[in-house]
Amino acid sequence: MSVFVMEIGTEELPARFLSGLEQEIASRFEAALAAANVEFGTLNVQSTPRRLALTIENIDAVQREAEEVVSGPPVRIAFDAQGRPTKAAEGFARTQGAELDELFTLTTDKGEYLAVRKKTGGRPVQEILSEVAPEIIAALPFPKKMKWGSGDFTFGRPLRWVLALFDSEVVSFTVAGIVSGNETCGHRVHGPGPFEVSGADAYAGTVRDKCHVTLCAADRRRVTVEGGDALAAQAGGRILWKDSLLDEVQGLCEHPVPCLGDFDPSFLELPAEVLLTSMESHQKSFGVAAADGSLMPHFLTVLNMTPQNSALVKKGWERVLRARLEDARFFWKADLASDFDSWLAKLDNVIFLAPLGSMGDKTRRLERLCRWLAAAVAPDIQEQAARAGRLSKADLVSEMVYEFDSLQGIMGGIYARRKGEDEIVAQAVSEQYLPAGPESPVPDSLCGALLSIADKADTLAGCFGLSMIPTGAADPYALRRCALGIARIMLEKGLRFDVRELFRYAQEGYGERQWKLKPEQAAEKLHEFFVLRLKNLFVSQGHETLLVEAALHAGADDVWAAGARLEALDRFSKSAEFGQAVLTFKRAANIIRKQGQEEDGGLDGCYDASLFEDEAEKALAGALEDIAPDFEARWAADDYHALFGLLGVLRPAVDAFFDSVMVMCEDPHIRRNRLNLLQSLVQRLGRLADFGALQM
């Protein structure tokens, strides 16, 4: 078995491109080799800022042979009445490179066709790779592509060399005017090269030993973490590692060398969030914390070389960071000299969404909506919730957030504390943007949860009124994330209120506006959108789709209750009684769904016991009446597990009813009474789940 190595050498690629390119190269080569019937063992793609390296081990040297049957024209037109081949048969044979006597009749469901057996494969794999490699390189996707020189070829950054080796032989092809070869280039300082690679097996060693490049991203990360931890320990601290920044840093270097720098301790007067953002955002550096968690006047950066004069390089990094921190200190002091009233006034000049008014308008709506939410779930914090809503966006006009927009909300909370606001208000303001994604936590405080819900509901109501509804992958205002955030907060914090009422109240907060959708139409579309997001959330948590639909059809306006009913239904679905219970109660639900609408005036679930003719009718009515007090008590206690357990009490009476009672009898009064008896059953069970949506 053989080894194939291909290295695409480029100018420095952005770190954010690398992970996606690794996946694209791997998937495209896997697909191309599968289509060509070439087998291989392992396929691995690694990257640095200046190279994309593919290694395929245990790859066949020769394409696997296969036989395929190619069908041609129908037999009836392939031969004339005398059985002689027609032009259709001759043309088919010629096209397939076959002799007429090699053709045979293929019988299919559609009739008889002329066909030929063809052997494929047997080509040297090097030939196949020389064809697919340049095609794959040219087709690699980038957020942005560029041209260079006088050619028309486009890529993420200019190509500089291409190495392609099949064992010790060069796989020859041309891409972007560059002819593939057996040479690679190394680190710009420590081993620029070019260096000849004797064979595919020698590639990794050449890159490591001669190029002085750490090809594996995991190895670069390990070198960074181990070296950084050692330097921090010498200073008596620990590095505040951040995974996303670590990923970015390893994508910025080929030869990582951790370097610990210092800054003036006077800068520690700034909030830790400001210091860390200055380091991480602008300098791609990490903070250092003491044992008690407080920041120390040090930072860790990662160099892309081993410097000859470490002290000089360290001094340069410190000088740049000092300038950043001086700016941050200026913003901090300027913001502390301002007050919330002046910021709130400025919000009236900051646009939220042009048709939806200013940020000042939004904070007034949030004040109103937060007060309403608090009245529903926590009346004792109504005033704090309203105040948090009013102050929520004030930091958007602060100097600090203007410079570091990632600190919005966080700085609002910090400034609220410094300016004497209630701690409940300050924490809520700092948590208002949570959760920021599927892995992000929800707000820790109740007031923060209410503010976050209000903010998201206000955005949803406004955008749906303007018909800015997400379609496909397009969601410019992150409305899906807003809906999921509301659902997660309600579920994880155990908040119970009617989401229809939430959206209606949020919609009313906009007052009279020129909407693109009528308010009732927008409200209905928003509710459907929210329920779909809730469904997706439950499915992503591992619940079966049919169970989720059954639970949500029974009611989704109380999100926490819907989740609790789903958990109980999920547990019930694993019991031995589930299958028969579904068949029984689904039958009742389907009868009501199909026949109920045909009854004049509909069905209300009220039946007349004097019209019962069969003992089974009386038994079912009696069973419903017997469990009613227990059912309502357990419903009030949210004991959904016990409620599903009551189905076992009801099922024998329902089964007996269906066995002996003709529901759709001739007498319209008796028929309607029996349908209302079933409606009474379905109404009660329908509060738990829509059994008609379940299947067995």
Curated annotation (Swiss-Prot):
Predominant subcellular localization, coarse grouping: cytoplasm
Catalytic function, reaction form: tRNA(Gly) + glycine + ATP = glycyl-tRNA(Gly) + AMP + diphosphate
MF terms in GO: arginine-tRNA ligase activity; ATP binding; glycine-tRNA ligase activity
EC number annotated for this UniProt entry: 6.1.1.14
Recorded GO CC terms: cytosol
Keywords, sorted A to Z: Aminoacyl-tRNA synthetase, ATP-binding, Cytoplasm, Ligase, Nucleotide-binding, Protein biosynthesis
InterPro entries in UniProt: DALR_anticod-bd, Gly-tRNA-synth_bsu, Gly-tRNA-synth_heterodimer
Coiled coil: none
Family membership noted in the UniProt record: Belongs to the class-II aminoacyl-tRNA synthetase family.
Protein name: Glycine--tRNA ligase beta subunit
